[in-house]
Amino acid sequence: MLQRCGRRLLLALVGALLACLLVLTADPPPTPVPAERGRRALRSLAGSSGAAPGPGSRAAVDPGVLVREVHSLSEYFSLLTRARRDADPPPGVASRQGDGHPRPPAEVLSPRDVFIAVKTTRKFHRARLDLLFETWISRHKEMTFIFTDGEDEALAKHTGNVVLTNCSAAHSRQALSCKMAVEYDRFIESGKKWFCHVDDDNYVNLRALLRLLASYPHTQDVYIGKPSLDRPIQATERISEHRVRPVHFWFATGGAGFCISRGLALKMGPWASGGHFMSTAERIRLPDDCTIGYIVEALLGVPLIRSGLFHSHLENLQQVPTTELHEQVTLSYGMFENKRNAVHIKGPFSVEADPSRFRSIHCHLYPDTPWCPRTAIL
C-alpha cells in the first residue's frame, strides 16, 4: 500500500516538473520597451566595452554621444541617425546611386545659377590666380568672383568680378572669417541659386559641379562638401561673458571647397549676414569654414552631406584615379607628408612645366582648349 502511494506521489512530482519546464521554454522573455531598445542599440554601436569607435573607425563620433543614457525614443533615433550617417559610405559619392550613375536631376541648372567665390590674398595673385584664369576660370568667368585683400590692375584686366574685401592679408581666423562674411553677403545680393566657396589652389570641374548641384533642389537645405576630420570637431561655445558650453559638429573643409543652397543660406542670415558672421565666429573662436559648419549643423540642425568628389591638399591626391577625373568636382595641389602632392596624370606637360598638374588636367577635360598640344592625352 505504501509502495503504491509512493509511486503515485513520485509520478505526480515528475509530471508537475515537466509541466513547469514546458511553460518556461514556451513563454518568451518580455519584449523590451522602446527606451530599453534604444539603450541596447546604442551600446551595440559603441561596442561591447561601451567605448566609442577609435579614430580609424568609419563610425567615429563624439564618444559622449554614443554612451550617454537615452531617455526617449526620439532622442535615440536622433543619435542613431547621426551614428549611421557616420558609418555609411560618403554620400557623394553622396550624389550618386549605387550603380555609379549620377542621380536624376532635381532641377535644371546653368552656369549663371551658381556663385563661385575664390578666396585669395594679394601675394598669390601671380603665383596662383594666373593659373586658374588660364585653366578652369577661363570657361566661366561670369560665375566666378575673386575675393582678395589688395588692389591689382593686372587682375582687374582678367575679370570684372574682383571684390576687395578690406580684410587683413594675414592668414588668421579673423581675416579668414572677414573674407567669408563678404562672400556670403555678395552671394545673397546676387540672387543666384547656389553658393560655392573654393580656395586659390583649387581646380573646379564646372561640368561635374553643375551635375552634382542639379541633384538637389536649391530651395531645400543643402550643405555639401568634404570634412578633413574623421569625427565631429569639438569646440567651446561662448554663451555670455562668463558662460561657455561644449559643442560638436561636422564641417566641410574650405580647402576642398563646399556648396550651400540658397534656401539654406537665407536661413543662415541671423548669424551670417551684415557682419554677424564675424561675431558668430568669435563665439567658437575657430576659422571661417568651421564657423559655417557651426551655423549649419549646430545652430540650424542641418547635417553636412559628405562628398568624396571634393579634394584638398590635406589628402593624398595621388590616389585620385585618372579614369575618374571627369567626375571630381574639385582638385588641389600642395605638399603632403613633406612631399609634392598633386594628381598623378600623364599628359602633354612635364612635372617641371606643370607642377600643379592643373594644365594637364584641363587638357584632359577640355582637349579643345587652344593652348593644349594636339597630342594624345592619357
From Swiss-Prot:
Residues the entry annotates as binding Mn(2+): D201, H313
Name used for this protein in its record: Beta-1,3-N-acetylglucosaminyltransferase lunatic fringe
Residues exposed to the Cytoplasmic side: 1-8
InterPro entries in UniProt: Fringe, Fringe-like_glycosylTrfase
Glycosylation sites: N166
Function, in words: Glycosyltransferase that initiates the elongation of O-linked fucose residues attached to EGF-like repeats in the extracellular domain of Notch molecules. Modulates NOTCH1 activity by modifying O-fucose residues at specific EGF-like domains resulting in inhibition of NOTCH1 activation by JAG1 and enhancement of NOTCH1 activation by DLL1 via an increase in its binding to DLL1. Decreases the binding of JAG1 to NOTCH2 but not that of DLL1. Essential mediator of somite segmentation and patterning.
Entry PTM: A soluble form may be derived from the membrane form by proteolytic processing.
Disulfide bonds: C167-C178, C196-C259, C363-C372
UniProt similarity note: Belongs to the glycosyltransferase 31 family.
Any one GO CC term of the record: Golgi membrane
Organism this protein belongs to: Rattus norvegicus (Rat)
BP GO annotations: compartment pattern specification; marginal zone B cell differentiation; negative regulation of Notch signaling pathway involved in somitogenesis; ovarian follicle development; positive regulation of meiotic cell cycle; positive regulation of Notch signaling pathway; regulation of Notch signaling pathway; regulation of somitogenesis
Organismal lineage: Eukaryota, Metazoa, Chordata, Craniata, Vertebrata
Keywords recorded for this protein, A-Z: Developmental protein, Disulfide bond, Glycoprotein, Glycosyltransferase, Golgi apparatus, Manganese, Membrane, Metal-binding, Signal-anchor, Transferase, Transmembrane, Transmembrane helix
Gene of this entry: Lfng
Keyword Magnesium tagged: no
Domain of life of the native organism: Eukaryota
Record's bilayer topology term: Single-pass type II membrane protein
Entry keyword annotation includes Hydrolase: no
Active site: D289
Annotated localization: Golgi apparatus; Golgi apparatus membrane
Major localisation: Golgi
